[in-house]
Amino acid sequence: MSVALFCGPPPAVSFGCKDGRGRKGMVRSKDIVRQTVKPPAHACRLIGWNKYPGSVVPTNSSLSPSPTALDDEIELDPSPFLIIYKDGRIERLKGTTVIPACPEVATKDVIIDPATGVSVRLYLPNVVDLPSKKLPVLVYFHGGGFVIENTGSPNYHNYLTLLAAKSGLLIVSVNYRLAPEHPIPASFDDCMAGFNWVVSHSAGPAPEPWLARHGDLTQILISGDSAGGTVTHYVLLRADAGVIEGAALVHPYFLGSKRLENQTEEDFEFHEKLWRLSTPDTEGLDDPLINPLAPGAPSLAGLKCKRAVVFVAELDFLVERGRMYYDALVKSGWGGEAELVHQKGVGHVFHLSDYSGDVSVDMMAKMVAFLRGE
């Protein structure tokens, strides 16, 4: 079975870049798609994020605003991720392109919960030569700040295809619901459901034949990047003991109410607002869901895995939070083996867009070695 990274060009889609006052003068790009969906009614009222009230409406009070003008009024502007209009539409600016599952490289999509629409994408490496071999299973959670990306995003599809080919693991990538339409903890709940769905194949009838035939359910690992790294920590606290062999947290999206020295005020404020948009009922950046080191957060000694590795990038806004997490884990009394991989000269999730650079190749080698237990 050959493993191809690209199954064909992404679909031709378009996206409009805002000029600060609606969609006037927008440019088109084939790489991004406009999604118009309705968020919860309260989501747009919570934070004053670059509001432009009425700026596209005629100033002459005798004129009635046109429907087009009203449609284009911006309520919140957390670009470059998304724009929320006053009529409730959400326009995602990135992370929406979907590459279809590729039968040529043994990938497929499976809906695991028809009620919520939560699905998984499975990546089965070359088993034609070893049809009876059972493979370790990696459950993966994608990033995107909880508001963008999906299992079919080109970066994730191509990266996980490559990872499956190099590691020889059967990978299950969870396609969870996004905020603000589905406020947190929906994404956390969906990922936990995806993990439990995989584990369920170890007892009783197995609904997914790939996992039943090729998955070694005694060797389950989990991983995620950015927001997916945050979810990885969440799952580690809630899984049954003895189920997870190892966990890899890649540039985990951990925040906190205190701005660190390496974090600019602009970046800090952006991520605070993004978290509040995603989590309307949050108490702030010391919510244990986003800050595992906050007062009252569950002890890291309770992580349910034997091995853990934390990847951090020198130029990443989140680098110090990742290092702090690793240090706290080592000091927590947790009984597993912990490793920190600090890579220099690169930024947040650099490895998803550059597969051939020296640092990316080194990171892939370290990830594969960890997953294999080498």
Swiss-Prot record:
One of its GO terms (biological process) is defense response. It is an enzyme of class 4 (lyase). SUPFAM superfamilies: alpha/beta-Hydrolases. GO terms for molecular function: hydrolase activity; lyase activity. Disulfide bonds: none annotated. Signal peptide: none annotated. This is Probable tuliposide A-converting enzyme b6, amyloplastic. It comes from Tulipa gesneriana (Garden tulip).
